[in-house]
């Protein structure tokens, strides 16, 4: 029997009961062990107790800060009920991530109305027929958090049936990375080896020669243990890395963990945005190495959340703080950008620049099962990322968040910590021992990479200038060494006493960040960050409203200032900048705001990466195309640059107006293409012609494109194809490697430039199909 992925990935309707899988599940349910016979672990919430280092459960961390606690509270009071209401109103019921988020949130934020909705949904799920998956992860969470097992027995039976089916028939299958994670979750409670074996099986059958749908997009192009690149769908790739890590840790088979770490390294050192986001392409996937466009960035909210899960797991497996560095960057920036300040609007994608055309406003979409449900689940459990405990009882302080927590030390000892932290707006944190175990124990303080002059591990991004200020650590007023170990931690080992005080101070001065030179979209640009927070320029804080056209003074001071009126009080950064293309204009003051807060004040331009010099031919332009001309007469013409679109508009379009002499469209010089295009459209507005294709173009929210004149097109060839020929047509092919210009010769003929013939200018019939590449002036 071939088992379709959806039959067990997703809870299905009663109609699924007719499938062979559902019949198998039904038979197994009848023959399965009774609940009291199934061996289950203690219901105390210890979701990753099988890792070398274990997180302190979210419900055992009491947040007291003014940054994360309000967000977790809004999530509980506004966002989760909103998501539940969407699905209930749609008569679909709610399950999966939303149900899991609600279960988690109710543990720390009781809500009678939400509790009643959760109870009703659990009853409905438990009683429904033909549910192939039965929600392994939800069942695990429900039992772990509450001890309730209404969904657990069905999940166990489903897993057992799947195990039997796969081991009997071993059908060709592309593999299920999330199914592997879910099976591991189930195994953590049952300790039934076949559930772990099923998780491993999902990985082992992936990418085999007889696997169906083998491709790089679904990470099945080769066996998983041979994969070393982060490729394909970003969420699924991160999920695959999580499942590899889980299986590697639980089985002790190092190749699984090695594969996950190699893929992580590829993502972080070549394919990650400065905001911690991953995924650059419209198919929700990883792009080529160092191809990190800003206006068309994907950086899906779901992807950064799964990547945060991966980074947390890799830390728990290895103790290496570099994984927390990357996790911290992602959750403070990309993840929080995914939800509005009010908790009721969402981003699916998180671009690093916006043209302000309105497409980058957060939305409230009904019944979307992807990003919002994942985000509410993340926020509900976020406190579980703050601390961890090693096998010898060492306490890891990973995130500096005002909070209270308690740890078991030895047979009966307890260590309680009360943290007061200024983070992320200030660098000072005070950790007070409020209960001591009476025996020697270790507290490990993470020294973030950004406090050690390291923007990200691997050097994809680095600070333009290193600062001499270092982190400081003191215990009871006595200065201690703040030099971290190889994993980024300072270990304080002693017999702690009640009232002992640890003081930590990190430099949180604003810093300019530059990207690896191979990241073309960040060339001659800087981003600005302070501590873990990445900043951006947004339209309300720019005099002209043109955040995409800012040129910042690279020598201007970066001044941090608290703004109590902005979203309840955040730290902004002030610097000096001027409009690009106006070198004689004096720089003015501009205020940068935290990236995660952008698009909360209406539609308008935004940019994370800010220019530090004027454009030159070959630079990536504001619309993501290529600059190919700098106009020396900008004061007269009112434009400074010509930018070529980043892709062809057609591989074979007609010029139009064949055998028709139109008024105008005769300009050949630089600066005449835009008027030529207007003349062409006025005379022959037929869709699909070269001029119409250019005029209707919108690239990443940027319009104003036109068909270049003959001399403009010749300049484009001369200034770009020497180094960027692959960006035009099919490099190396001589057939139809010629582009239309907007310059008319006669009623029958118009100019074109042959890119396969050294850029020679020719004239040909307007009715002949040729390539089209739009340009724009700004």
Cite the ranges covered by each PLM segment.
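Helix-terminus loop motifs that line ligand-binding clefts
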Residues: 98, 112-134, 207, 271-280
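N-terminal export signals
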Residues: 7-28
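C-terminal beta-rich recognition modules with glycine/proline-rich loops and embedded aromatic residues
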Residues: 36-38, 72, 199, 260, ...
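C-terminal, surface-exposed recognition/capping segments
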Residues: 615, 632, 687-689, 703-704, ...
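Secretory targeting signals
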Residues: 1-3
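Aromatic (Trp/Tyr) and acidic
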Residues: 37-112, 132-146, 154, 176-194, ...
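Asp-box/WD-like beta-propeller blade repeats and closely related beta-sheet repeat scaffolds
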Residues: 152-170
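Extracellular adhesion/carbohydrate-recognition regions
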Residues: 615-699, 737, 749-752, 766-775
